[in-house]
A protein has these predicted regions:
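Short loop/turn segments that connect beta-strands within beta-propeller blades
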Residues: 1, 45-49, 87-92, 132-136, ...
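Conserved hydrophobic/aromatic positions in well-ordered beta-strands
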Residues: 23, 42, 67, 84-86, ...
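Surface-exposed extracellular loop regions of Gram-negative outer-membrane beta-barrel proteins
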Residues: 35-40, 127
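Short loop/turn segments immediately following the C-termini of beta-strands
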Residues: 38, 78, 88, 124, ...
């Protein structure tokens, strides 16, 4: 049965909305849920559905999940709008207490990941970017090529991301840009890569691949 249901108002009847997955994070001794919504980033109590906080400033269409790390939540608009960060633990309308808010012009589909104080995110036009979590400033921005729809995957200190043309890029998760490898699958890819138990799963248009050390 439905445990709780929270109604949310839409902006208008155009093709605007949220494709973002709710993200659970820990604050002190309890869990909260963050969700990038049309125009806002919001936090909810996962047990009751009660809205705990909200922050204005996102665009009308949001694809990426909220990025979590270093006590910060980062909401990223999907289409030509903004990106912003708030500190965990806020209550009520925290718009005036945003950590930072920056405008952007490139479309983002895949979700980003936070590692050691930096947000790593991909742009649909084929650009990977490293952003300082504390300031929102871009540290590096490099064109990988193709159209990047997949989410950034962090495994250890390496980043993995795929483009729709079927290439998989491996980057160093560092404020100094370094491309480690580029692998061509020769099949279209729109899904994000998925790790499990030392293996990497890759879903293309026609096949599902598992990459890793061969097991006995």
């Amino acid at each position: 049965k439905t445990v709780w249901d929270t109604a949310e108002k839409g902006i208008n009847d155009k093709l605007y909305g949220s494709w973002s997955t709710p993200v659970i994070y820990r604050v002190g001794d309890h869990d909260e849920v963050a969700l990038s919504m049309p125009g806002q980033l919001k936090g909810f109590d996962p047990l009751t559905g009660k809205e705990l906080w909200k922050c204005d400033g996102l665009g009308p269409s949001n694809y990426p999940d909220t990025a979590v790390g270093d006590g910060v939540l980062i909401g990223v608009s999907g289409f030509q709008k903004s990106m912003m960060a708030v500190r965990m633990g806020g209550r009520g309308d925290i718009t005036s207490n945003r950590l930072w808010h920056v405008e952007m012009t490139q479309q983002r589909v895949g979700s980003g990941v936070v590692h050691d104080g930096y947000l790593y995110v991909s742009n649909a036009p084929g650009i990977a970017e490293c952003i300082d979590v504390k300031t929102g400033q871009s540290v590096w921005k490099e064109r990988l090529g193709g159209t990047l729809w997949g989410s950034m995957l962090l495994v250890g200190d390496r980043l993995y991301v795929s483009n729709t043309q079927g290439e998989i890029f491996i980057l160093d998760a560092s404020p100094q840009y370094r491309l480690i490898a580029r692998n061509a699958m020769e099949e279209h890819i729109k899904a994000s890569l998925a790790p499990s138990d030392g293996q990497l799963f890759i879903r293309t248009y026609k096949n599902l691949y598992c990459v890793g050390a061969r097991r006995k």
